């Protein structure tokens, strides 16, 4: 595994300078610090056992053993042997968050990457444009759209590899940026904005007509995220069509929702190029799955199903079988499948055979039962259309929110709270010559892991957290977990917890804990009892009355 040691050194220098700048009498020898930092090397201690959030999957048409996996906040990984081993190929670039990856169908050495995840959560990573590799990921060139922040999809014209479309969602937390549908006709040297809606609306998905790439479909998405809420949708969201390779566009409306729309996923199939599918976030009975049988000119509402979980903004990807136009897969908490052209959907398998929260799916064009699925828990493969799955436990891409270290000797341990992977505990080193292995890590608490802490005097006592302020004290010797979340008194209003609530152990008394909801709590007995130290410290405003856009 490779790491960017120069970037790490720069960050270390910046940190030291920042901390020391208040001490005006102190002189800093930058050259000495830089020399010391360059000698530091990062090493991987995992874990890979749980995977991490996959944003996109690309498989070479010319050599199906070559796969690229785009990770929400873990770069781009490549395998040349069907997943037996992996190599990170994007570590030296300036963005760690990937939203889309595409392989040139005419030359598998040419790979395009769109940085910045294509979801709208508070935890989303953003990017710095579009990258291109001409040597299978060995080297990269940043080609443009530096202010796009989030790329939904990249499409390469199969007739001319210099023609590439990029769906740029634009910044999530603000207006403007590089937003809309962009096109290059010179392999990324220059870019033209061919579909511009407004400063708040980007493009989240695009598809070619499989029989005629001059026909392009695009899904526009109006959105805005604030700390207190997400506005997913608006009057400018919708489905657009071009019949001249992106030169002119028309917004389609016949049969589509009359009200405002949110995130839209599109899909086409070479089995019948007249059919276009769309899953549309909308209000009430207008939401759901839509089908066109005349290349997007008019649409019919099939049902009201849309992706659920934390909201359609987190999913909405759909894929259609290349050989059966009625066979559709929709990404959701559990993958859903329709075998009747979108009229009915059901969970693929039981949904429990693999990790939940799915974002990407590849269908083998030679064997429709062979699928690759990317989820919050990493990459999975099935050869029986989801009846059984195998996980790839060799991708160390978990997204850690917080971590803490204990005071064990000779090697300290780490506890980390990870997105959708729970809380994990593992050693910093082992006596094994192979280093830290998957088997050295374990998961004492599931769900999403957040703030955590070892008791500084007793490394067998660990505090771990689940979303919404659920706090657990865990005994590593007995493997007993106890819920110690503070509770309001009789007659008091319910506590309002952050998704990631703050926890602190007093440096003066290891029995004393501080924990935060809308007020500050203190425990002097390791969480067995709690006392509120403050009133409501928030403004207690109704978030629905705050301006969103």
Stretch-by-stretch model annotation:
Residues 1-28:
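Bacterial Sec-dependent N-terminal signal peptides
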Residues 26-549:
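Beta-propeller blade termini and top-face loops
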């Amino acid at each position: 595994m490779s790491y960017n040691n120069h970037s790490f050194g720069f960050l270390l220098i910046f940190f030291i300078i920042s901390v020391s700048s208040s001490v005006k009498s102190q002189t800093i020898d930058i050259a000495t610090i830089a020399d010391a930092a360059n000698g530091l090397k990062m090493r991987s201690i995992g874990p890979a056992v749980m995977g991490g959030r996959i944003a996109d999957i690309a498989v070479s048409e010319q050599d199906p053993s070559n796969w690229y996996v785009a990770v929400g906040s873990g770069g781009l990984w490549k395998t040349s042997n069907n997943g037996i081993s992996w190599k990170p190929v994007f570590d030296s670039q300036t963005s760690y968050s990937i939203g889309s990856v595409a392989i040139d169908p005419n030359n598998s050495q040419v790979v395009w990457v769109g940085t910045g995840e294509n979801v709208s959560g508070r935890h989303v990573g953003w990017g710095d444009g579009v990258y291109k590799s001409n040597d299978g990921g060995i080297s990269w060139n940043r080609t443009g759209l530096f202010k796009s922040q989030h790329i939904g999809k990249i499409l390469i014209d199969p007739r001319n590899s210099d023609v590439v479309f990029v769906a740029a969602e634009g910044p999530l937390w603000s207006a403007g940026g590089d937003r809309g549908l962009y096109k290059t006709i010179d392999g990324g040297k220059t870019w033209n904005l061919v579909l511009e809606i407004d400063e708040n609306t980007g493009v989240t998905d695009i598809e070619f007509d499989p029989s005629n790439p001059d026909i392009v479909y695009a899904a526009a998405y109006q959105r805005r995220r604030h700390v207190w809420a997400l506005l997913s949708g608006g009057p400018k969201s919708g489905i657009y069509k071009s019949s001249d390779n992106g030169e002119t566009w028309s917004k389609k409306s016949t049969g589509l929702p009359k009200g405002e729309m949110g995130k839209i996923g599109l899909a086409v199939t070479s089995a019948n190029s007249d059919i276009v599918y769309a899953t549309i976030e909308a209000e009430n009975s207008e939401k759901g799955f839509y089908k066109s049988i005349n290349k997007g000119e008019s649409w019919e509402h099939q049902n009201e199903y849309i992706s659920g979980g934390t909201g359609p903004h987190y999913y909405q990807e759909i894929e259609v079988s290349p050989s059966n136009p009625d066979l559709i897969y929709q990404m959701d908490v559990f993958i859903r499948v329709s075998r009747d052209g979108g009229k009915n959907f059901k969970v693929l398998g039981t949904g429990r055979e693999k990790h939940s929260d799915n974002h990407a799916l590849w269908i083998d064009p030679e064997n429709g039962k062979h699928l690759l699925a990317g989820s919050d828990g990493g990459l999975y493969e099935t050869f029986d259309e989801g009846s059984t799955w195998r996980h790839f436990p060799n991708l160390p891409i978990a997204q850690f929110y917080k971590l803490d270290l204990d005071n064990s000797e000779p090697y300290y341990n780490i506890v980390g709270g990870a997105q959708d992977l729970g809380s994990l505990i593992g050693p910093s080193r082992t006596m094994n010559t192979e280093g830290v292995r998957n088997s050295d890590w374990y998961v004492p608490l599931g769900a999403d892991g957040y703030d955590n802490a070892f008791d500084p005097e007793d490394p067998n006592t660990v505090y771990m957290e689940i979303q919404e302020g659920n706090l657990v004290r865990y005994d590593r010797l007995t493997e007993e977990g106890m819920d110690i979340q503070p509770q309001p008194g009789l007659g008091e209003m319910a506590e309002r917890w952050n998704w990631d609530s703050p926890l602190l152990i007093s440096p003066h008394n290891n029995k004393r804990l501080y924990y935060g909801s809308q007020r500050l709590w203190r425990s002097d007995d390791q969480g067995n009892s709690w006392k509120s130290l403050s009133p409501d410290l928030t403004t207690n405003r109704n978030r629905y009355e705050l301006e969103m856009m």
